[in-house]
A protein has these predicted regions:
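Conserved class I S-adenosyl-L-methionine
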Residues: 1-35, 37-46
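Conserved SAM/SAH-binding beta-strand->alpha-helix loop
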Residues: 67-69
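A short, conserved alpha-helix within the catalytic core of class I
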Residues: 111-121
């Protein structure tokens, strides 16, 4: 049986074009940190904007989402463009990644706090986590209405205490709310080398 959440995302993706899917800003801005090869995972991938960037940079990429519609469209897009993406319908909350399985993990606009330890341990030594999601401090109504799906100030840092911090950005409500990064937090962290 299809859940309400799955139905919501299936409807959204049914009308969408995967060619228009773009990578999240934190991944684009810090793509220079990516390794030249290795295994990557795009969590809650949607139409695969992050997965496409990762695969295009030479990483063997897996993309997981609970929407069969989104995954079908991503598979078709990857095949048409010769991208090494293995797109799978998978509920990452029930089936988290295996420990030490990935060199890169990207999460954008998805928040399941209980999954944070599994994401950190799924990184290989020296592996990178790129994370971008909504914050409770917001200047407009973009993002989810439920505060459970938004981060408290500095919470993203607290969710990944064992990673080496390479980049972090969260501007909250400081300064001119019409400028800068608003409504979101970004993190790039690395699992320490063995």
């Amino acid at each position: 049986m299809t859940s309400d959440l799955e139905q919501k995302w299936n409807q959204r993706y049914a009308e969408a074009d995967p060619a228009a899917a773009t990578p999240c800003a934190v991944l684009e801005q810090f793509a220079h940190l990516l390794p030249p090869d290795g295994a990557a995972l795009d969590v809650a991938c949607g139409l695969g904007g992050n997965a496409s960037l990762l695969a295009g940079r030479g990483l063997v990429t897996r993309a997981w989402d609970r929407s069969p519609v989104g995954i079908a469209k991503l598979r078709e897009h990857a095949e048409e463009h010769g991208l090494p993406i293995r797109a799978e319908v998978r509920d990452v909350e029930r089936e988290p990644p295996d420990p030490g399985a990935f060199d890169v993990i990207v999460v954008s606009y998805f928040l399941e706090r209980a999954l944070a330890p599994a994401l950190a341990t799924a990184l290989r030594p020296g592996g990178l986590l790129f994370y971008q999601t909504w914050t409770r401090e917001a200047v407009d109504d973009r993002g989810p209405g439920n505060p459970d799906f938004r981060l408290a100030p500095n919470e993203l840092l607290e969710l990944f205490p064992d990673l080496r911090l390479l980049a972090y950005r969260e501007e909250g409500l400081f300064g001119d709310p019409a400028e800068g990064l608003r409504n979101e937090a970004w993190l790039v962290g690395a699992r320490p080398p063995a």
